[in-house]
Amino acid sequence: METISSNDKHTTKDYIAFFDLDKTLTNSISGKALATAAFRKGLLSNWKLLNAAVLSIEFRLRLRDQLKTIDAMVSWVKGIPEKSIDDLCTEVFNEVLFPSVYKDAISEIELHKAKNAKVVILSSAFTTICRQMAENLNIDDIICS
């Protein structure tokens, strides 16, 4: 788990507003978008893609421990250089995730910030994606995996 704090550490906020990334800030699912892009680039085999689909179903139906499922879902990155994953995350962010940000989500963020809230992304998405979303939407902090 990674926590990134803004530089605005000395300002007292009245409350904290948490936002999930997938299907809350965006109309996309970051893991699905990453898996699709990784498959197209040859970073994810047919077998691993099929396994990810099965794990996704198990996750949604709560057929297995949620944390174990999440760990299994991201196991495909093992052995891939971190730079390659970061580049893939940046590509997916720019081409899929950021363009799918809900306009209402932007309004909600602005509303909370106007009311002196600390705005935080709380997500199981990759750190690179959460960080880029926070920077582009003027979000104060992230808590992500």
What are the language-model segments listed below?
Residues 23, 85, 123:
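Residue-level signature of catalytic and energy-coupling elements of molecular machines
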Residues 28-31, 43-111:
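A metal-dependent, Asp-based hydrolase signature
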Residues 2-61:
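Active-site neighborhood of HAD-like aspartate-dependent phosphohydrolases
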Residues 108-137, 141-145:
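Substrate-recognition element of Asp-dependent hydrolases with the DxDx(T/V) motif
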Residues 19-20, 92-94, 114-116:
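A short, structure-level motif marking secondary-structure boundaries and short turns
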Residues 24, 98, 119-120:
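A generic secondary-structure micro-motif detector
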